[in-house]
Amino acid sequence: MKKILFIDRDGTLVEEPFDFQVDSLDKIKLTSGVIPALLQLQKAGFTFIMVSNQNGIGTVAFPEEDFAVCHEFILDLFSSQGILFDEIFICPHTPENNCICRKPKTGLLEPYLKETVFAKQYSWVIGDRDTDKEFADNLGVNFLPISKTHTWEMVASAIINDARKASVQRKTKETTIDLSVQLDSDQTSVIDTPIPFFTHMLEQVAKHGGFDLRLQASGDLEVDEHHLIEDTAIALGEAIRTALGDKWGINRYGYTLPMDESLATIAIDISGRSFCDFKGQFTREFIGGMATEMIPHFFQSLSSALGATIHIEVTGTNHHHMIEACFKVLGRALRQACSRTNNYLPSTKGVL
């Protein structure tokens, strides 16, 4: 689904002149950092829509031709750098006209909005005024300001990182799972489960996956650890799947890893299709209080919730090392598969 940035012009894309009217070429100056930021956001799959209030176009104070020359020059500047706007909406009225198209009202965009399906949760208004914030509220999308202290670099980083995080609360009669992930964060994860070995394994996934994982898990261990491990895997898969959004630009595939005498190999495809094949033999019933039969089940539950195909095989003699290798290689595979290094969706179907 389309992700849209509704971007103001004066004060956001170009510097606001002293008289608040861009009516001559010598008044045009791009805002600092706007080009690299928009290129980064464009690569991340965002569509750009320009929405601007231009007071009194066509009046003696602001002739149509003066506006047109400057506006075309601005568009040419951006297009010369590979930045294009899918649509441009300009309100020519003054506040006194009390029109339906002047921001923060949305009348100017109504025909476009009726014909366009887009992901509001991943779309933003970017502007320098309070009216831009109100405009975002009226559209039902997010907002980020541009100012001397909140730069385009900060805006691009915030949008890209925000688009790749998710939280899942899973509460059943057997377990309570509170989990969140942020895929583009190198913060130290905070993981708390009542099974220390399982906690340690999840720390390996987050560390080697290069993402921030926050987890608080509790369950009916007096019955069995099955429910806790299964529900944690389901919550983790759901959270990563949500955080990936439309999967635009991801690598999709990944990875292999040795550990001491153990060797774990994995092939993962975040395709939207669930399948898991786990090959490995454990002769011990428990490792660190965790049943070894739950290792394959963790990967199967994760595969189902994530919507991924996972093939994993592990060999070795030290069961701790074998299991740890499985979780580390999962992290490495997720890091590779979730990384965004493309500017397209890696599927000929057009959807993952």
UniProtKB/Swiss-Prot annotation:
InterPro entries: HAD-like_sf, HAD-SF_hydro_IIIA, HAD_sf, His_synth_bifunc_HisB, HisB_N, Histidinol-phos, IGPD_sf, ImidazoleglycerolP_deHydtase. Disulfide bonds: none annotated. The keyword Oxidoreductase does not apply. It comes from the Bacteria. One of its GO terms (molecular function) is metal ion binding. It catalyses: D-erythro-1-(imidazol-4-yl)glycerol 3-phosphate = 3-(imidazol-4-yl)-2-oxopropyl phosphate + H2O; L-histidinol phosphate + H2O = L-histidinol + phosphate. Signal peptide: none annotated. Its main location: cytoplasm. This is Histidine biosynthesis bifunctional protein HisB. The gene is hisB.
